Amino acid sequence: MAPIGEKKRFELEKSIEPIYTGGPVAFDSNEKILVTALTDRIIGTRSETGERLFSIKKDEDDYVTALAITSDSKKLIAAFRSRLLTIYEIPSGRRIKSMKAHETPVITMTIDPTNTLLATGGAEGLVKVWDIAGAYVTHSFRGHGGVISALCFGKHQNTWVLASGADDSRVRLWDLNSSRSMAVFEGHSSVIRGLTFEPTGSFLLSGSRDKTVQVWNIKKRSAVRTIPVFHSVEAIGWVNGQPEEKILYTAGEGNLILAWDWKSGSRLDPGVDTTHSETNAIIQVVPFSENTLLSVHSDLSLLLRKRVPGEGFITIKKLNGSFDEVIDCAWIGDDHLAVCSNTEFIDVISTDGTQVFGVLEGHTDIVLTLDSSEDGVWLATGAKDNTVRLWNLNIEDNVYKCIHVFTGHTASVTAVALGPLDVNGYPTFLASSSQDRTLKRFNLGSQLNKSDFSNRAVWTIKAHDRDVNAIQVSKDGRIIASASQDKTIKLWDSSTGEVVGVLRGHRRGVWACSFNPFSRQLASGSGDRTIRIWNVDTQQCVQTLEGHTGAILKLIYISQGTQVVSAAADGLVKVWSLSSGECVATLDNHEDRVWALASRFDGSLLVSGGADAVVSVWKDVTEEYIAKQAEELERRVEAEQLLSNFEQTEDWQQAIALALSLDRPHGLLRLFERVMTAPHQPNSITGNKDVDNVLVQLPDHQLIILFQRIRDWNTNSKTSMVAQRLLRLLLHSYSPEHLLKLSGIKDILDSMIPYTDRHLARVNDLIEDSYIVDYVI
């Protein structure tokens, strides 16, 4: 029996999965539905809650080139590289119509304000207008000499018009009433990436990668103003769509969104934009709400940017798009996680996956390791840039600050570990290891806030002969453990850096180690697929846990040190009881190796992250499970007693129904044997007419259960007579049409035929042998 307090059951509370892996994005501002493309599907997500509304399967090799959603939230239109244009019903995801759109892939498309027309632009330079309801072409416009890159519906002098831009640097205006070209605007020197009509319909604005916005007078067919925006433009539009505001935004290169007075050409928010990035660019912008835009970035991030007059567009929220490969995670606070995922940034996210609270920027290469303090205030990070950073986290105010940068390693930092907190709440020291095979200690404490703080290592030692994969600090801070590819775990005096023990026994490299916070034990996990529990004092292995089919990559203790949780390359997370040495729970929600594992400080939640870009949040439901088990046991005891009472009173109808619902094959067999050995009633197959009447009126779900029991009993000669009599009754009482509707009935009957033939042959042999008795007599 497991000790009191052990956790035996976990349920998946939240699976934070990628919603975006690149390509176009569509957004319905009315219902707040975000439509994005994944590798093998198109999904719709409620942007405010993260709830997945629909998922549309597509060919993995067929890339989505354009998306559009009607403003009434009823239809989604997707264009594919295969040149198909498909209309879907949402939220059901049902395909309404598919048709071949262009001779080349559709690059851009837009829907008119009435949800009647769809405009598509192809790579061949052709523009088509479609009737959405009828799914047929109403207009086809030729004239551009390159790929269509921007489209926009508008109204000019009560006439519906369509503007198109292409990589021939020209803007064309088409009259939808006459199906003719109204104007050709020339003035840009690069591809057109954004088009929008001034709210009165008198002017058309175009943005280009030539870093300018042109304002065109439609009536005069000429440019009235050129606005130099000083960045390559990928999108333009109106900040909130209100005509009286007339605030133009431009977005694109450098991660910038800027606000402009389109009449004067002056920038409205001259303050420094802190979101500027040389390597990250905005590839698409869609209106989200009043003064707020959703920007899609080349690094696959999705940001909500709100305009604050005088300050510019500030990031108010980051939506979880894709983590890429999750390498490590750490719990900070009650419902926040720090996650590193194959980038130089660390995301601070909510455990429900709805948003990213902050992004820790500072490392210049991929972050490989994290460790947080027990109070969630301090976070240590190590990266491929050979540096270690210490962060102070103010979760309540959502302020995250890098306090110090520690250097000295000559290769990627593979592991970091914080020492225990001092009386003032500061971590006493920080340990780090690297692919340079060294181990370093940096003193912290209250000196962190002093101007003369030294970020130099107190000591540096060559720890192992091969890469160091993991390090851990004991609860009291006296010992540092290091695990290496050289198959050993070494114990170090944290004050002096002297080795105090070497643990040998693993047959392959050791990937993980963890100190038991409540005893002098250490757990280690290796590429040999085993977990070893070591006595720190004697340095002997006291227990070996086996069950994974891949390398053990991460270990943590829970339940006051009575259990170990392991994450492995087989994609599984296992919970082990140290008292029995057995796995008490296996958590399966990953399709690739699980690198990251963390536990909330009260042990009520586990988090795992894997190479499949999925973060899984597991909730401890042991108490509910035990209570449910006790309730189920009580219910079964009562039902067993009730079944016994029914048998005693020969209430066969109630007895059979109860035995079937309890799924007790032995009890049901005993009941039928008793009926068939009792005095036989005439004209009854089972021997009792009441039983016959019950069996010929069974509901389908109980009927299929009975067929399954008959199949099992038919395999044994001792119980085959009961099975054959019941089978005869059922085949005579139910029509073939009725029986064929039962799920799996064909396989059940097919499996009974060989045994039935064998029983028939055995009975025939007995009959033949009985004639010998007649002959002798």
UniProtKB/Swiss-Prot annotation:
UniProt repeat feature WD, residue ranges: 14-57, 59-98, 101-140, 143-184, 187-226, 228-270, 362-401, 408-452, 463-504, 506-544, 547-588, 590-628
Annotated localization: Nucleus, Nucleolus
Keyword Nucleus appears in the UniProt entry: yes
Presence of the UniProt keyword Secreted in the record: no
Gene3D superfamilies assigned to the protein according to its UniProt record, in alphabetical order: YVTN repeat-like/Quinoprotein amine dehydrogenase (2.130.10.10)
GO MF entries: U3 snoRNA binding
Disulphides: none
InterPro entries for this protein: G-protein_beta_WD-40_rep, Utp13_C, WD40/YVTN_repeat-like_dom_sf, WD40_repeat_CS, WD40_repeat_dom_sf, WD40_rpt
Origin superkingdom: Eukaryota
GO biological process entries: endonucleolytic cleavage in 5'-ETS of tricistronic rRNA transcript (SSU-rRNA, 5.8S rRNA, LSU-rRNA); endonucleolytic cleavage to generate mature 5'-end of SSU-rRNA from (SSU-rRNA, 5.8S rRNA, LSU-rRNA)
Main location group: nucleus
Pfam families xrefs: Utp13, WD40
Keywords, alphabetical: Nucleus, Repeat, rRNA processing, WD repeat
Gene Ontology cellular-component terms listed: 90S preribosome; nucleolus; small-subunit processome
Role of this protein: Involved in nucleolar processing of pre-18S ribosomal RNA.
Subunit structure: Component of the ribosomal small subunit (SSU) processome.
Protein name according to UniProt: Probable U3 small nucleolar RNA-associated protein 13
